[in-house]
Amino acid sequence: MEDKTNTAWKILGFYLLIILFVLIAGSTSAQVVVTHYNAGWNNVNDVKWLKKLEDCDITKVDIVKKPKQQKKHKIVVVPTIIIFKDGEEVKRFQADISFSIKATREELQDVINEQLMSDF
């Protein structure tokens, strides 16, 4: 009976170790943040595919509601998408005169992947 108890505890400990590893690995990989700056009056030009980006956190900022963010990040045209790594800007995509972004999901994903791979 004691052998079965020890084996059960070892298995449980192994599973807990795996869960802990997954949690730690998941929390360290969220170093890349993609922030989409836009304004309520320009919602027609929201970047709809942004949520399909992988291995990053995605945030949206309405510059009308958060003018301090607009000033801090020097947003002069909307939409603007900025990719941050560890809080530092690494790439910026800005709208053209039509207030729409020409960058593709693939272009942004490439930048995200490059940033993640630069850690290795």
Regions found by a protein language model. Give the residues of each.
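Bacterial N-terminal signal peptides that target proteins for export
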Residues: 2-16
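Bacterial N-terminal signal peptides
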Residues: 13-25
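Local sequence-structure signature of Cys/Sec-based thiol-disulfide redox active-site neighborhoods
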Residues: 29-57
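Active-site-proximal beta-strand/loop segments in catalytic clefts of secreted hydrolases
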Residues: 37-39, 63-64, 96
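Extracytoplasmic/secreted envelope proteins and their assembly/folding machinery
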Residues: 46-47, 67-70, 105, 109-112
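A short beta-strand-loop structural module common to alpha/beta enzyme folds
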Residues: 57-65
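Structural micro-motif
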Residues: 73-83
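Non-catalytic, surface beta->alpha helical segment in thiol-disulfide oxidoreductase systems
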Residues: 85-120
